[in-house]
């Protein structure tokens, strides 16, 4: 299960609790206690402890065990503690992984500074991460709350490109819309455009680093 999970999601899974097979709402494995790790370098791994991890399976190919295919996994009611130094690892995962769908619901994200103090607590209603060769895009959707403001975040990049991405953040009450498009020439050279729409006023800024 652990090796297949890594193969399908590019995430390391350590199972520490019981595993139950459940049919509803769709066939899935319910893992009572586990941890997941993102990143190939042990010094830059991000690890999270997960209770009641649901790993959904392809119903057309449940047996034999050696041919089980996972379709997606789902996490609920989990606190994610992320340090400043771990941001680049997360970014690299979203940009470079070829994971099957990931769903996170009713959880919280804690951003921690270098002194182990909590900078931000963001309640998250849902996070969906999908990669698809069919429409040629990787997509990240987040719906949550930040500084008592409800927001929706949408990020996408071309599936076969590591250099271009787009992000849109929509805050509600007050209505603030931020869009950013980033184009990399290489790892150290990029250009982009950021636009801010607030009170029916739009400001657009272009930038580049060579």
Please provide the spans of the model-predicted regions.
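A broad, low-amplitude sensor of folded, mature protein cores
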Residues: 6-12, 86-91, 165-167, 192
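Interface amphipathic segments
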Residues: 43-49, 64-68, 111-210
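Flexible beta-edge/linker motif
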Residues: 17-115, 123, 130-143, 181
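Disordered, low-complexity tails and leader-like regions
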Residues: 1, 24, 31-32, 53, ...
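Extracellular/lumenal and peripheral-membrane lipid-interaction modules
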Residues: 1-19
